[in-house]
Amino acid sequence: CTWYDFAREIVKLAGHNCEVRPCRSNERPTIAKRPHYSVLSKTKVVNKTRTTLRPWQKALGEVIEEIMNKRNILITGGAGFIGSHVARLFATKYPHYNIVILDKLTYAGNRENISDILPLENVVFIEGDITDTMLVDEIFVKHSIDGVLHLAAESHVDRSISAPMVFAHNNIIGTITLLEAARKAWSNSYEGKRFHHISTDEVYGALSLDGGAFSETNRYEPHSPYSASKASSDHFVRAYHDTYGLPTIITNCSNNYGEYQYPEKLIPLFIYNIVNRRPLPVYGTGSNVRDWLYVGDHALALDKVFHEGKCGDTYNIGGNNEWTNIDLVHRLIEIVDEELGDEAGKSLELITYVEDRAGHDLRYAIDSSKLKQELCWQPQMSFDEGLRRTVRWYLANTEWAERSLAKE
């Protein structure tokens, strides 16, 4: 049936004596036009017996818009750190969306991270590799994927230095595999489709201590195999937009922290080491500066950009929260010692300065003003509250950390 027929049936079921017809040139549509869904943008519902129909009209609009906005979203890396937060947000905030989570379940991916949403009717989990062309093509066709949030990536800089080919294969070839699958599956029409590639601030290179912050117009200067692989994947995403018109969008974020992060990154690793009285290795003098963003705020930003961002654009996502590594370690020690009921400063003795790693960028900082001005987003979680919440989660989930580490 046509959408006019559908609207007529809804009106009939509601018991209203109304006419459903195309808009005339001087009329506003009953259902407001949405950014990606314009099928009902010319539909008019006319009440024949009353002067106002706002109460039921609102209900009708909600019903039809929910059906019209039903989407099939593929989230790659959805069992990882950031991906699990994004998958949880989308699965619960948009129950009318079908969420397909694709994750290889490497050492950093864990079904436990999404165990609370796996039973939901709108969630499907697939264990698989984004470089598997046949699998990815099948997922796009079988699940009628019309939106992608691509988070799957190898992301540890130290590991990239020792195994650059792994990073090149997974981060570059994996991204191209997804882009090709989207291009083929969406070849009939790009309307209502979106490919959102999640990247890092490390593609921009390093800043001096007084060098301002990275904006979306900064040139790329990656210094590690990890950042080079992400920079390359960013360029492929842009190339698919420029060459094929694929509706892509890129976000580059600063350092994330929060629950479910594999304990190889600074914050979860140091919490784990403090609890187990192990050394806290600090590179060089600890003077390197990073901008920190709570993972929940990042997930909300991705939601905002995915739904409201402009295709072909790039958006930076930062926390406006710069800390030197050594100052962060000191603050982390304060909180963990306090939460454990230990004497203040007890764990300072665990700090161990080690040789700086190769290509260690001095400072990262992200300018998120474009995202704030165009999409009205800014981080909500204060760093102290987020850090304390993170510490408490890891202290309450020590078995999760043990099981995660045992996977290697």
Description of each model-found segment:
Residues 1-67, 72-73, 128-131, 268, ...:
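C-terminal substrate-binding subdomain of Rossmann-fold SDR/epimerase-dehydratase oxidoreductases
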Residues 48, 117, 206-207, 259-260, ...:
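Residues that scaffold the ATP/ADP-binding catalytic core of kinase and kinase-like folds
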Residues 68-256, 296, 306, 325, ...:
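N-terminal Rossmann-like NAD(P)+-binding domain of SDR-like oxidoreductases, especially those catalyzing
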Residues 41, 62, 174, 233-236, ...:
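Internal, well-ordered alpha-helical segments in soluble enzyme and binding-protein domains
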Residues 86, 208, 261, 265-266, ...:
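Acidic donor-diphosphate engagement hotspot in glycosyltransferases and nucleotidyltransferases
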Residues 52, 102, 153, 263, ...:
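A broadly tuned, weak detector of single residues within folded domains
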